[in-house]
Amino acid sequence: MAIFVYLRFCLVETADRQDFEGDLRAMAELAEAQPGYLWSDMGASMVEPSVYIVVSEWYGIEHVRTWEHEAIHEEIQHKWEAHYLEPFVHRRFTSWERPPDT
């Protein structure tokens, strides 16, 4: 079953956003090579410029967990933890399909 992952990052004012965006792009490229990766999209909020959102879809939860514990991915996560204004938001969702008409 497909798993959707939602990530929300809110950076402090002094964070280097260009560096952060570069790391997001690097992680997106690395994710594309991971087993079970289907797609992702990311960007800055149109409402709050210090907020970034990442949404991705994976074939299964095992693939998400493997990706989350990939060494380079963990290294980048830890690099930015001190630069969050708010707690990092991480949610997982399963897809919903309309039941057939009965």
What is the predicted function of each stretch?
Residues 1-51, 59-69, 85-102:
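Short S/T/G/P-rich N-terminal loop/turn motif that feeds into the first structured element of a domain
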Residues 68, 77-80:
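Short, flexible helix/strand-to-coil boundary loops that buttress conserved ligand/catalytic motifs
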